[in-house]
Amino acid sequence: LTSFEFPGEYYEIMRRDFRNLAAETEFLASCAPPGSRVLDLGSGTGTNLRRLGELGYSCVGVDQSASFVEYARRAGGEGVEYVHGRAEDFATDRRFDLVYSLFMTLNHLPHDKLRTVLETTRCHLAPEGRLVLEFGHLLNFVESYQQHTVAHHRGDDILITRLARQSVNPHAATWRNEETLLVRDADGQVSLYDNFFDQSVLTGPEVRGLLAEAGFTVTAEYGGFRKEPAPGHGRGPLVIIAAPTPKEAI
């Protein structure tokens, strides 16, 4: 379960503290040449797609947050289209040269939906296309676990204080994240928003197995978007590049 129904401009400010847009863009651009058709599953406020659109890619983004999709459409972007909906429900006859899902979007899906989403994604890819997945390892969750966190995010004369609470459901293997966002705008007005999301705990072997079952072959693994070596002990994020397995090889 996820909400993420708060103004997209606030998410953009918080995202800057967690992500390296330049590294992500360079990584994605290395997977498909300019002019390629790109699909972003879990596109959020469209940050990655706007940058790829500027580089000449033809882009489609899918996100379940109405607030984020509204912001992304207002923000514009050359050659970028946005669809409001869940990744597992997205249907199209178009084929893409690159499909990606970043910022732990894969962890937001229930375990019983993962294989279906990957099988559907396989159908979205062109025969020579590539899939890029970024997800959090099991130990990444364990090491970063804090029951209560207070963080401040600043940008565009806006101050966001994020009060986060984490809890664990061991039976479902999920992390529940509950957040209260206290926002002071540039004009001094203060507003309050609640946000929550569940994250499934995943492991590298589990995701590799699901990819194989869905008809993919893993071609590369990294520990980040600067193509750092993938950690062998399950810490930190894992970035996987996969290609459709030829039918004769299945």
Model-derived regions, located:
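Class I SAM-dependent methyltransferase "Motif I" SAM/SAH-binding loop
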Residues: 42-44
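C-terminal lobe and adjacent flexible extensions of AdoMet/dcAdoMet transferase-like proteins
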Residues: 200-250
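A short acidic, Gly/Pro-enriched loop at the edge of an enzyme's catalytic core
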Residues: 91-98
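Class I SAM-dependent methyltransferase SAM/SAH-binding core
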Residues: 46-89
